[in-house]
Regions:
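Catalytic alpha/large subunits of respiratory electron-transfer oxidoreductases
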Residues: 1-205
């Protein structure tokens, strides 16, 4: 239980995720031998990986974590590459979306999770919190119930469990917003505790 994050609640996606597991999912390591994947033990797999790393220059080794990788595993992979392999060739953007990681503000969520409840204006750009971050969506709903927070979205997201105003999701409309050329730009200036949530899909525009 973490009162600052989920307040002991879990989403339906979390509760029933076990029903979505496929019986043909990967449950053990496989080695590719003569163009065929053969089941093997973890010990044998680790031995093969170790041998490959020992006999390969660090500038020839790269790592890629997928969208379903949990934070702990991703961090361990990063530490392994930075401290053991001595390589920075590591990425997690499976869709090749550019994010400058040299500046922290490009990838951190500046507001705290529970701090969302205090916002008076929330803007969604390329983000659907109900399906992408259910805990976040629950906090946004609390913000609306608690403060009647004004919520805007570039694009219709369907039922988010709270009312919001839909704006055009065209790149020109989003560009006008950031150039202070639409009404929402003025609302942002007058807001005391605004939050803008930019989702990954916005980077594909």
């Amino acid at each position: 239980i973490n009162e600052d994050i989920n307040e002991e609640w879990i989403s339906d996606k979390t509760r029933y995720s076990c029903d979505g597991l496929k019986n043909q999912r990967i449950d053990s390591p496989y080695l590719k031998i003569e163009n065929k994947f053969l089941k093997t033990s973890w010990e044998e797999a680790y031995k093969k990986i170790t041998d490959k790393i020992k006999n390969t220059s660090s500038d020839k080794i790269a790592g890629l974590t997928g969208d379903l990788t949990n934070m702990e595993t991703a961090f361990i992979v990063k530490e392994f590459f930075n401290k053991i392999i001595k390589s920075n060739y590591l990425d997690s953007r499976t869709e090749n979306i550019y994010v400058n990681i040299n500046d922290r503000k490009n990838y951190i969520f500046n507001a705290s999770i529970n701090g969302i409840e205090d916002t008076d204006l929330l803007i969604l750009v390329g983000a659907n919190p109900r399906y992408e971050a259910t805990i976040l969506n629950a906090r946004i709903r609390k913000a609306y119930l608690k403060n009647k927070t004004k919520i805007f979205s570039f694009g219709d997201l369907g039922d988010l469990t709270y009312p919001y105003e839909v704006l055009s999701n065209s790149t020109s409309e989003i560009n006008k917003f950031f150039q202070d050329k639409i009404d929402l730009s003025e609302k942002l200036k007058k807001s005391k505790k605004p939050i803008i949530i930019i989702g990954q899909s916005a980077l594909k525009l």
